[in-house]
């Protein structure tokens, strides 16, 4: 493929993506609606603080300026919230699950309490970058992963 054809194809692709993305964004109107953020932890903790900070501003930037509420659903390391988001929330775009990312591995590892298909969740983003650490005592004899 010549350089000119490749450039033309890329340009056409960009134009189509912009057109279709813009059209889809214009279709959504949340006027009179309420968006619910289901938090997998108790009020007052870090996940709750992130959700409330997002809720305070989120509706201002969506068409129709919907109300945004936070619904804390603690328990089982946020598995209760994940199960609820997947099984009981209507798939209408008005519910956002805010639970610990590792909870989706429960289903992949065969946890019978994980009542969802983790591959069917749509990832929106994360309010913060979190670093995890694994530590053991020297007495275990484990030196690395």
Residue ranges, per PLM feature:
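Bacterial N-terminal signal peptides that target proteins for export
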Residues: 1-11
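Bacterial N-terminal signal peptides
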Residues: 10-19
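N-terminal (or domain-start) structured segment
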Residues: 25-120, 125, 138-140
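Hydrophobic/proline-rich hinge and linker segments of small-molecule sensing/allosteric domains
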Residues: 125-145
